[in-house]
């Protein structure tokens, strides 16, 4: 996945992705607008169960359009089970999406309402596949927890992550990031909506069972500004900040959104 051929500006942004990635116009694309009146309560949905080992946090990487906090996923130490999932899924990384102002930046919307940002915790099906790279293109390959972020009080649980950004300011930089429990970033209620969708940026594989938390988490305007301080340019190049990195909602095309609550 060459990140040079896509991005979030007018020349290479979401409207252009279908030229290189025709699946961008597929039937199961993400994100979506969640219409709460049309989400169907499904009593068969189980509670979501996460068990994360802080020792599996490994490093933080500037990938150009965002940054990833990467986990050791060589064994089942940090896993997601339950919810809509038949298998156990292993945490591989989390990342964020944001916008150039505080009134938008999330990828998923709820009844048309935009949030200030969105956290994605990415897991792969370790019961069926041997690596994230193998699972990424399989229909049951990935499960992503999406947490909407709303501007408000500062979030102390986010601060360790945000403070590490200075060590990976430019594209391609990586730095150790250890002993972190990502469950500290989850809301207190794990009520959720779920639907079948895709990665929200190229290669846009339709391989994701989405678990979108009903409850949002907060972060302050200053914390949002820290996200926007990340650079998509490499060291020695003119500085290009990542001001915005979210895809707009895609058509539902007949899919069902289920609610656990």
Swiss-Prot record:
Domain (Alpha-carbonic anhydrase): residue spans on this chain: 4-261
What ranges does the record give for the region Disordered, renumbered to this chain?
Answer: 239-261
Query: What is a single molecular function from GO for this protein?
Result: hydro-lyase activity
Keywords of the record, alphabetical order, are: Acetylation, Cytoplasm, Lyase, Metal-binding, Zinc
- What positions does UniProt annotate as the active site of this protein? 65 (proton donor/acceptor)
The cofactor named in the record is: Zn(2+)
Which positions does the record annotate as the modified residue N-acetylalanine?
Answer: 2
Name any Gene Ontology BP term: response to fructose
Activity control mechanisms: Inhibited by acetazolamide.
Location relative to the cell? Cytoplasm
Annotated positions binding Zn(2+) = 95, 97, 120
Gene Ontology cellular component list:
cytoplasm
Q: What is its EC number?
A: 4.2.1.1, 4.2.1.69
Protein family: Belongs to the alpha-carbonic anhydrase family.
- PANTHER family in UniProt: CARBONIC ANHYDRASE (PTHR18952), CARBONIC ANHYDRASE 1 (PTHR18952:SF282)
- Give the function comment from the record: Catalyzes the reversible hydration of carbon dioxide. Can hydrate cyanamide to urea.
Know the name of this protein?
Carbonic anhydrase 1
Its lineage reads:
Eukaryota, Metazoa, Chordata, Craniata, Vertebrata
């Amino acid at each position: 996945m060459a990140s040079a051929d896509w991005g979030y500006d007018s020349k290479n942004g979401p409207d252009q992705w279908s030229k290189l990635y025709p699946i961008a116009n597929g039937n199961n694309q993400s994100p979506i607008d969640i219409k709460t009146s049309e989400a169907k309560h499904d009593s068969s949905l189980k509670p979501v169960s996460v068990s994360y080992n802080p020792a599996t946090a490994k490093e933080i990487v500037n990938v150009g359009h965002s940054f990833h906090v990467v986990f050791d996923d060589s064994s089942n130490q940090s896993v997601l089970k339950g919810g809509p999932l038949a298998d156990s899924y292993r945490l591989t990384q989390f990342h964020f999406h944001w916008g150039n102002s505080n009134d938008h930046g999330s990828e998923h919307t709820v009844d048309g309402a935009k949030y200030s940002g969105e956290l994605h915790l990415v897991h792969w099906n370790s019961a069926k596949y041997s690596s994230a790279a193998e699972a990424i293109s399989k229909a049951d390959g990935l499960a992503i927890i999406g947490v909407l972020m709303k501007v408000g009080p500062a979030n102390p649980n986010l601060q360790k992550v945000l403070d590490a950004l200075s060590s990976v300011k430019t594209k391609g930089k990586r730095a150790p990031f250890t002993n972190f429990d990502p469950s500290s970033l989850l809301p207190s209620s794990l009520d959720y909506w779920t639907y079948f969708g895709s990665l929200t940026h190229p290669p846009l594989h339709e391989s994701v069972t989405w678990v979108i938390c009903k409850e949002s988490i907060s972060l302050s305007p200053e914390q949002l500004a820290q996200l926007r301080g990340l650079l998509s340019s490499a060291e020695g190049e003119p500085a290009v900040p990542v001001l915005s990195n979210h895809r707009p909602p895609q058509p539902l095309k007949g899919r069902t959104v289920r609610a656990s609550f």
